[in-house]
Amino acid sequence: GGSATGYLMNAVEPDVIEERVAEIETTIGPIEVALFNLGAQIGDRPLADTSYKQFEMGWRLATFGLFRVASAVLPKMEERGHGTLIVTSATAAVRGNKGQHSHAAAMGGRRMLCQSLNAEFGPKGIHVAHVLIDGAVDAPDTLGKLLGPERFEQLRSTMGREHDGLMLPEKIADTYVHVANQHRSVWTHEMDLRAFSDTAWWNHG
């Protein structure tokens, strides 16, 4: 049981992230666990079709957005001596595929930023975890919109549901809860998640 509150924001606008963090800390209470789950996928584009604006947008969402959240949240956690920041990432953080110039650069930056944040704040009692989502997630609002209703439903019928070939958001959430509750003597910094039937990113030819 419990309650939840949602907010809409444009994460590339100045001050909106910082103001929302301050509001939550004041009106709801101290942030014990922060989850950064902002995507930055603009699709497959050859270099010639990737504009400066599109490339920068990936960085603003994936890397600079995390920097802003960390800058707003981690100092408060440091004052309290504990806290957790879990960062959702993608295979692009460790492998740059053709046509993924913006996404790979942005996610690679996200991963390195997580390592830097962990080096600074881990010894201060703050758990920073970087989670690679190495596969397709059964999410109508993201993958469904990317593929379109017909292709998404076809994918669900062949790989999802009882086939367990698409990652279920609620099972990802279970894993995040586990990470958030880890004892500090056994903290996970980086982990990767995928369906049992998927080939791990390092085994792709």
What are these regions (language model features)?
Residues 18, 39-56, 99:
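Conserved mid-core segment of classical short-chain dehydrogenase/reductases
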